[in-house]
Amino acid sequence: MSPSVVLGVLLLLSPQTAGGAAGVGTPPPGVAPSAPAVAPTFEELWSAFVKADAAGNAEAAGLALREIRRTRIERNIPSLDGVGLGLVERGVAKLDAEQREEAEDAFRAAVGLAPGLPDGHAGLAVALLKKGPFGVVPSIEAAASGVSSFLPSGRGALGARNLATVAALLAVFGIAWAVAGALLVRRGGLLLHDLDEWLGPAQGRSASLGLFLLLLLLPVATFQGWGWLPLWVLALLFAYLDWRERALALVLLAAALAVGPAVASLDLRLRTARNPLFHAALAAVESAPDAAVIARLEEAVRSDREDLDLVYLLGAALRRAGRYGEAAEVYRQVLAKDPANAVARNNLANIEFARGGYESARARYREGTEAGAAPEVAATSHYNLSLVHLQKFEYQAYNEAKSNADRLAPGLVADYDRWRYDSRDYAVVDLGLTREDVRDKFAGTEAGVAVRNLSAGARPASRGGALAASLVNRFAASVGLFALLAFLVGRWRGPKAFTLHCGRCGTAFCRSCHLGQVSGGLCSQCYHLFVVRDGVSGPARNRKMAEVQRADGRRDRMFRVLSVLSPGAGQVYRGWTFRGAALLAAWYGVLALLVADRVVPFTEVPRRLSPPWLPLGAGLALLAVWAIANRFRPERDVELPARPARRARPAAAAGAG
């Protein structure tokens, strides 16, 4: 049945006409319907469906949907977003009317016709959730399917990259603050102790404390901004950190160095998203373009007729809009200039195939299988040629051509097999630009194109220069400045200096104030009290035990506070550096995604259609991280060294001699 006949039948919407439509013979298996020069648009088919549904003619409405599905396959349209949004609107109306099953059917139809539209998947998830407990798992699957289907699309990939970039920047900023705060609490007293020793007893504690605060807040005091404080603190304390803490600090400094390129790439994508021609090209590649899109592409072709990419996009847009005659004329003009143009030859043959001109299509497909053709072109030509043989019931030739296509490009042919009619027959496939080609063609341009004739082998300009330019910023300068600061602090302390916190009482001690050799990270009194177990008077023992108890209580309280406020920071404070960093990455990563989605939304699904699973999953992940961070804590910072062997008394040694 031709599309024009179907449209006429649907527009009449009378019982007699509907009955007559049922009696019209459908094409035999393997024979594709022919297309007129101007086929029905999807707007016309959708209007026919709406009228049939409003008239209560279920048969005509079903026929309209089948024709929409058939036309989508014939024109190789990945996602009918316009029709999908119409079905989503109907599903929402059914949900408001408490007609859950009808709403589910509408959303399923939207998912089938527009798999790249997240609204249909979200609406289906909401409708399934209204089933009750038995609809929970299918609802989660529908929501996950919506994300996985939208992600490969042009808009989905662009939104995902923007969301990931913003979330990564926010997460690194939060992690840097948490790590700097934990290490400041853990190691800041060592710097304060060295300042005390450097100023001497004549200056008093208040002078060293004031100098300590001035050093910590120097970026704010010099009007550089409070955002630099985490990296400044890490550089200031770098000489006091152990190797694990230094490794984490270096990772954060490297992340700061990557801020410039990340922001530059985000700016490039945002400039691309402001290009109206980019959105027109994207619609021509993965949707059914409307008249405005076609007009914009026609204007672009008129301004640059030598850019074949724009010509291919215009031809694809015209064919997917049902304007077969105009699309054929576009390809004929290309072939008049270059008879060997593989894209124009294949796509013109597909239009002839849709019109029933199998012999002329066969001749053009065979030209594409000649020696010297690119593998993807030859595989596509063999694949389309096999369908011509199938129309003629030439099964041996069909199998031979299909085998050649599978041999040349098995992955490509497997992708082509998704274009399958309800009758289980396959559709011929166009050649042209992919989503990735469209992204590269318009990358970084707010108007016009960035690369001409990408399909002819032109490559995008190298972004090495732009990457190098993005590294010249304050963040790169800060890395050098902080390296200099860490070096100066190390030179100020001296090469043989050490400053430690006693692992038991928490007292800070250094080379100047410590007598004897350091063993096990303990001060002299704790070493004699807990290891030698001798040489400490009773009152001193009692005072030291009270200090140990206060230090343990202080460490436990600080661990709880840090873990409650910033899960993972407590582990960093108590010495589980890498485990704490992993918890911080999970905590701030989830939080950053939630915040970034408000700034650069991944999808445009309205809130009323958004299922609760993604926020609920994020909440459960945050709860799990918080529970783990507060449940598991490190033991003491140090283990006591072995007790030294007692020396034999001189008298006993002489008697033994």
Residue ranges and their predicted role:
Residues 96, 130, 320, 354-355, ...:
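Register position in tetratricopeptide repeats
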